[in-house]
């Protein structure tokens, strides 16, 4: 058999190219974390892997290998090979990987070669590529200056970032808008997948000739996704650009994000009745998540207004009453908290301005570096 190996020196190229990858690990391993361009076509499913692992601990490697062959043979073996071949027919340049680039990769490569197809496997496997991506995140703050984009809730920071080539949208990677109402309909990635996606975004960013890395001024947690500690620490000392926006525009934007888009998304996913119920649950649960910080009286006031707005929306198909609780939430909760946090970093502020003025300032910042 000819062994075709992709060396660790090519990890960078794999992630930049979005190289199609066949992940041979068991589903339980894949679900904890993998890579965006990978598909899980396991050599062994969870129960098979568990049995082989127990055998390895109790009887050693040779016994475990023999058990693996007895579990994956005949029809089962052919089904696994067919699944790989089907994927390879659509992605003939794909690579294989298992946890460490060991026996599972080698055996799969052998079986595929016997079927007439030679497929390389990645040296070091998942573990090697994962460690490489962790290193990318740890090194990133030292490669170029970080610049933090700040602004009150509803000021349009995400929309602004999407127009900047030097920016990475952390909330997009986390699939969460950052605030207590920031949950999206689709779930957030696992912590490992969040970190892997961040690292790959950093690799792509580093290909550009950018004067800085522009990021939104985030908390340590974006929903349930935690920023890597070293990366977050570097963000806390970054220079700051503050995006300013009129209150009426902020309110209109949040009405669209919290109410119109989420309601539409739930309806499209679940239908009219179940969709509205899920949408109502999303709003009330989001408010409930900050109940302690609001205090009992303010929470109850907001909840009453929100329920009235939901009733009006259900019965009259009008959403204007939602502006009442959004306005109260901004002025009594989000804005004071934002001002308090920004004041602690006041010495780091380089510029304040509107969307247009901030774009112009950043263009000049880029050209002067």
Swiss-Prot record:
Residues 15-138 form the Rhodanese domain. One of its GO terms (biological process) is tRNA wobble uridine modification. Gene3D superfamilies: Rhodanese-like domain. The active site is at 98 (s-selanylcysteine intermediate). SUPFAM superfamilies: Rhodanese/Cell cycle control phosphatase. Keywords: Selenium, Transferase. Its EC number is 2.9.1.3. It catalyses: 5-methylaminomethyl-2-thiouridine(34) in tRNA + selenophosphate + (2E)-geranyl diphosphate + H2O + H(+) = 5-methylaminomethyl-2-selenouridine(34) in tRNA + (2E)-thiogeraniol + phosphate + diphosphate; 5-methylaminomethyl-2-thiouridine(34) in tRNA + (2E)-geranyl diphosphate = 5-methylaminomethyl-S-(2E)-geranyl-thiouridine(34) in tRNA + diphosphate; 5-methylaminomethyl-S-(2E)-geranyl-thiouridine(34) in tRNA + selenophosphate + H(+) = 5-methylaminomethyl-2-(Se-phospho)selenouridine(34) in tRNA + (2E)-thiogeraniol; 5-methylaminomethyl-2-(Se-phospho)selenouridine(34) in tRNA + H2O = 5-methylaminomethyl-2-selenouridine(34) in tRNA + phosphate. InterPro entries: Rhodanese-like_dom, Rhodanese-like_dom_sf, SelU. GO terms for molecular function: transferase activity, transferring alkyl or aryl (other than methyl) groups; tRNA 2-selenouridine synthase activity. It comes from the Bacteria. It is an enzyme of class 2 (transferase). NCBIfam families: PRK11784.1-3, tRNA_sel_U_synt. Involved in the post-transcriptional modification of the uridine at the wobble position (U34) of tRNA(Lys), tRNA(Glu) and tRNA(Gln). Catalyzes the conversion of 2-thiouridine (S2U-RNA) to 2-selenouridine (Se2U-RNA). Acts in a two-step process involving geranylation of 2-thiouridine (S2U) to S-geranyl-2-thiouridine (geS2U) and subsequent selenation of the latter derivative to 2-selenouridine (Se2U) in the tRNA chain. Monomer. Belongs to the SelU family. This is tRNA 2-selenouridine synthase. It comes from Shewanella sp. (strain MR-7). The gene is selU.
């Amino acid at each position: 058999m000819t062994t075709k190996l992709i060396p660790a020196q090519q990890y960078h190229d794999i992630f930049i190219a979005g190289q199609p990858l066949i992940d041979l690990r068991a589903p339980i391993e894949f679900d904890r974390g993998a890579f965006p361009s990978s598909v899980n076509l396991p050599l062994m499913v969870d129960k098979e892997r568990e049995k082989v692992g127990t055998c390895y601990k109790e009887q050693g490697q040779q016994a475990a290998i023999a058990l693996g062959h007895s579990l994956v043979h005949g029809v089962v073996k052919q089904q696994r090979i067919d699944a790989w071949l089907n994927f390879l027919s659509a992605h003939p340049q794909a690579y294989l990987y298992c946890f460490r680039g060991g026996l599972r990769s080698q055996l799969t490569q052998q079986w595929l070669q016997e079927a007439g197809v030679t497929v390389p496997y990645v040296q070091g496997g998942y573990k090697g590529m994962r460690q490489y991506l962790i290193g990318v995140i740890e090194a990133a703050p030292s490669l170029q200056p970080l610049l933090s984009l700040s602004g009150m809730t509803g000021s349009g920071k995400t929309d602004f970032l999407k127009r900047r080539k030097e920016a990475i949208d952390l909330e997009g990677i986390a699939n969460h808008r950052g605030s207590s109402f920031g949950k999206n309909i689709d779930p957030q990635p696992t912590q490992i997948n969040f970190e892997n996606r961040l690292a790959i975004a950093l690799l792509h960013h580093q290909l550009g000739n950018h004067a800085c890395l522009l990021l939104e001024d985030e908390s340590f947690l974006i929903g349930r996704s935690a920023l890597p500690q070293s990366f977050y620490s570097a963000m806390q000392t970054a220079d700051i650009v503050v995006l300013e926006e009129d209150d009426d525009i902020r309110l209109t934007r949040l009405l669209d994000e919290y109410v119109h888009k989420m309601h539409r998304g739930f309806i499209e996913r679940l239908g009219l009745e179940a969709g509205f119920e899920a949408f109502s649950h999303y709003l009330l649960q989001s408010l409930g998540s900050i109940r302690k910080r609001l205090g009992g009286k303010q929470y109850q006031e907001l909840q009453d207004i929100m329920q009235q707005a939901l009733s009006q929306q259900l019965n009259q198909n009008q959403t204007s009453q939602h502006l009442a609780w959004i306005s109260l939430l901004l002025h009594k909760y989000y804005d004071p908290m934002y001002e308090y946090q920004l004041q602690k970093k006041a010495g780091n502020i380089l510029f304040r301005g509107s969307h247009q003025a901030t774009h112009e300032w950043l263009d000049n910042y880029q050209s002067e570096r």
